[in-house]
Amino acid sequence: MNKDDDKEGMAMFSALIEGIKPIAQDKRHFRTPLKTKQEIELKEQQLHANSYFSDTYQPLLPVQGPMRWLDEGVDSLELKRLRRGDYQPDLLLDLHGYRQSEAKLELAALIQACVKQQSQCCCVMHGYGTGILKQQVPMWLVQHPMVKAFHQAPKEWGGDAALLVLIDIGDQPHRR
C-alpha cells in the first residue's frame, strides 16, 4: 500500500460515516463485578493487621537473653514449655525477604489461620541479625489479643532466628 491508497481509503470511510450519530446507552445497567473470595479475605487481613499492630507501641521486652513474653493471667509453665520445645508448631511463617508492611499482614493472617484451624502453636521465622523484622515481630505479637505467649524457638525450629508463639484458641483441649 502507498500513501495515496491510504488517503483515498480514509476519504471513502469519512464519506460513509459522515451523518452517523453515536447511540446513547439508556437500556442496560451494568453491575460492578463481585469481589472474589481472595480479595475479601485480603481486605479483612489488612483491616485486622492495621487494627492490632502499631509500629509506635514499645512494650517492655527483654534486652538480653532469649526473646520471650507471657500475657497476664497465663501460667508461667506455658513459657517454660515453649522454651523446652514441648509444643510442636502446626503452622510455620517464614518472613525472610518481606517488607515490614507485608510481614504485618502475613503475621495477622497466620494468627487468624491458627484460630480457624484450632492450632495452638505456630512458628514465626524472622531471621538472624539485628534486622527490623527481628525487632518488630515481638512488638506486634505482644499487641495481638489472641497471643498468649512467645519464646525464642529451640534449635530444631530456628533458634534465635525464630519465635514459637502460643495462640489462644478458646476452650479447646490443649495439644502438645
UniProtKB/Swiss-Prot annotation:
NCBIfam families: PRK04946.1. PROSITE patterns: SMR (PS50828). Belongs to the SmrB family. This is Ribosome rescue factor SmrB. Signal peptide: none annotated. It comes from the Bacteria. Acts as a ribosome collision sensor. Detects stalled/collided disomes (pairs of ribosomes where the leading ribosome is stalled and a second ribosome has collided with it) and endonucleolytically cleaves mRNA at the 5' boundary of the stalled ribosome. Stalled/collided disomes form a new interface (primarily via the 30S subunits) that binds SmrB. Cleaved mRNA becomes available for tmRNA ligation, leading to ribosomal subunit dissociation and rescue of stalled ribosomes. Keywords: Endonuclease, Hydrolase, Nuclease, RNA-binding, rRNA-binding. InterPro entries: Smr_dom, Smr_dom_sf, SmrB-like. Its EC number is 3.1.-.-. The keyword Hydrolase applies. HAMAP family: SmrB (MF_01042). One of its GO terms (biological process) is rescue of stalled ribosome. It is an enzyme of class 3 (hydrolase). Associates with collided ribosomes, but not with correctly translating polysomes.
